[in-house]
């Protein structure tokens, strides 16, 4: 058997990872997956392929806004690949204290970094309650700077 390269590991994990949207948002009436759901589905694959994952987070102020950056790194011990995602932090968010605001931004950034690294589709599920609602086609007047016709 040939030794898998780093990219082979990542490609196999991307293909085998199943992280279903098992959470439900009652307010928006849609299913979603959390960062924890992704990590739970990922652990057996990391073990199978002898890889490890690290997640580090940093905060910085950009143009007067607090921004949290989540960096997800996968490694086989020799080579590493990483992806970063950012989320704004609103310390004055209604109904949340500062720790909850940071936690919410952390979860969001982590989820999207994981999703980008492992190519997870984050569109709404096919069983979403809004799947059969008609979608309005954009009109040229709704698209500033558009000069032409739309063919659909």
Could you say what each language-model-derived stretch is?
Residues 1-152:
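Polyanion-binding surfaces on beta-sheet-dominated domains and ring/shell assemblies
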């Amino acid at each position: 058997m040939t030794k898998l390269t780093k990219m082979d590991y990542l490609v196999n994990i991307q293909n085998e990872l199943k992280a279903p949207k098992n959470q439900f948002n009652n307010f928006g009436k849609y299913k979603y997956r959390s960062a924890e759901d992704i990590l739970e589905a990922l652990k057996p694959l990391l073990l199978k392929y002898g890889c490890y994952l690290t997640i580090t987070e940093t905060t910085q102020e950009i143009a007067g806004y607090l921004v949290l950056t989540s960096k997800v790194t996968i490694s086989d011990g020799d080579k590493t690949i990483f992806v970063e995602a950012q989320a704004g932090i609103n310390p004055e968010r209604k109904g949340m204290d500062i720790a909850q605001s940071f936690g919410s931004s952390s979860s969001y950034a982590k989820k999207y970094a994981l999703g980008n690294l492992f190519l997870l589709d984050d569109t709404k599920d096919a069983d979403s309650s809004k799947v059969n609602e008609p979608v309005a086609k954009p009109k040229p007047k709704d698209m500033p700077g558009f000069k032409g016709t739309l063919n659909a």
